């Protein structure tokens, strides 16, 4: 059986623990699922120069920041959403996915600030209490600690959440403040979006089930 191929889209920085944890969490899932995984970091600016089907056999992880150029990362988010590739988004990419829908479907006609800036500063982690509300979230947290770590906190305008929930996303978990923390795209259930960083709490003995779910989606693609 051929190896699972995963493109990690982001600007790798050895000084950021979240970037190291991204690599390690894939190693954890590879060992747990007994599947070979080949993963590669690709800068967002490089992705936009790829040929249309160059990543056809890949899964994509839209990695946490910081990003050297937010414009290129936003473009990468758009490309992935409009592709047929299974994807995982963690950290700052949460903001960019929401922003994509707001702009693509004109969900903010008054041009108000409907999603806050990141409320966590620097290379630090805050804890967040996850409360599963959807089937995927309930399944994930039936076997995993509901305390997660995050370097990103965004507050989304409640009315926008309702519009997104009605037409565009399945909310799978909130936090203790009832802010959305985990969702999947309604028309692409193989795209998982987490505001927090599940890779941080993944270990070799207990790989994070969100990472496992993403890897399984990539595996299904290789078997088609």
Predicted regions and their residues:
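N-terminal beta1-alpha1 cap of cysteine-dependent amidohydrolase-like domains
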Residues: 1-145, 150-187, 195-224
């Amino acid at each position: 059986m051929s190896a699972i191929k995963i493109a990690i889209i982001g600007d790798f920085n050895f000084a950021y623990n979240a970037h190291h944890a991204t690599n390690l969490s894939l190693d954890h899932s590879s060992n747990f699922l007994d599947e070979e995984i080949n993963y590669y970091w690709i800068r967002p600016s490089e992705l936009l120069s790829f040929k249309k089907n160059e990543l056809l056999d890949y899964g994509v992880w839209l990695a946490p920041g910081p990003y050297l150029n937010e414009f290129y990362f936003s473009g990468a988010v758009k490309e992935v959403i409009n592709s047929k590739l299974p994807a995982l988004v963690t950290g700052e990419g949460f903001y960019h996915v929401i922003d994509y829908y707001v702009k693509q479907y004109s969900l903010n006609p008054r041009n108000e600030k409907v999603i806050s800036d990141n409320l966590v500063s620097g290379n630090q982690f805050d804890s967040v209490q996850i409360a599963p509300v959807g089937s995927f979230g309930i399944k994930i947290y039936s076997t995993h600690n509901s305390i997660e770590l995050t370097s990103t906190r965004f507050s989304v305008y409640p009315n926008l959440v309702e519009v997104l929930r009605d037409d565009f996303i399945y909310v799978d978990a909130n936090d203790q403040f009832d802010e959305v923390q985990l969702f999947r795209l309604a028309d692409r259930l193989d795209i998982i979006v987490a505001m927090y960083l599940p890779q941080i709490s993944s270990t070799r003995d207990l790989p994070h089930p969100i990472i496992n779910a993403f890897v399984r989606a990539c595996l299904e693609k290789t078997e088609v």
